[in-house]
């Protein structure tokens, strides 16, 4: 195996600016990133923890010969060895999202939506709740007996859209699959890990129904004299799934229940999300563990604690390791009280 095909550790500061995510909070830098000084940052709504997107590309922290290189360029040099397949397709985009205020009420189209612009695609995603304030929650799907006409009437009146939706109080560990056509919003005080599925060289599309009547200044700060964010009423109405379940029945249909893979005295291994092309496993506890690539690109994201691998290479809270498919097995030692996610991009990871 050539030297450059060892796992790479990514820079942990791939943050969006406040103007892009004006609803952001401060927990990402204060609670979820070891070794980053919160005083250097203000509001941070998103950290793109694994990204090949040119807008916010992941960059390498180590090894030294790849330092600050774009991860996309590193993979492109030997795609078969990194990805484990010949198609060169990586669908995963991984974000950590912290909502200081509620996000807009929105919906994503499917890839089959005829009005998608060139260079864009649908954006199936999922949420794994990692922190929340007391009583905080999400909005997910349409409430009982709500019709398209009800939503249109609320929009016409400039009324609060929340009564048309299901508010779901959350707990740490809750997981939800957000399929195309699902109306949704993350509520204030909720922090989630969000894996998304996007096409290479395309941007996932979000259509906003409503943004809670907010206006913003140029820097992304709330300003009653400012400008509202763009809404996409007609597209949002067109792609919403109006048929099917409502209310609590819909919420439960979107909830993903973890499956225990292995349980040791000091370590729990679970499958916590399955999005088809991408699956997400969780390791919680301490001790030695062989993380297998399953012949596909593998992403390890540390939620808490830390791990050591190789020649004393360390990854701590908020850090990401990307393991090439060809690597086979990463022998890792987890610190006490470590919590990490292992994400597989490809059919072998399911």
Q: Where do the PLM segments sit?
A:
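Intrinsically disordered, low-complexity linker/loop segments enriched in Gly/Pro
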Residues: 111, 131-179
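Transition-metal
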Residues: 1-147, 211-254, 280, 348
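Short histidine-centered beta-strand/loop micro-motifs
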Residues: 85-86, 95, 116-119, 288-294, ...
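Loop-centered beta-sheet repeat module
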Residues: 156-214
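Short acidic-glycine-tyrosine-enriched beta hairpin
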Residues: 165-177, 310-330
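His/acidic/aromatic-lined binding-pocket segments of jelly-roll/cupin-type domains
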Residues: 94, 103, 125-128, 167-168, ...
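Acidic/His-leaning functional-site neighborhoods
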Residues: 250-319, 326-327
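Ligand-binding loop in jelly-roll beta-barrel domains
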Residues: 98-102, 111, 121, 132-135, ...
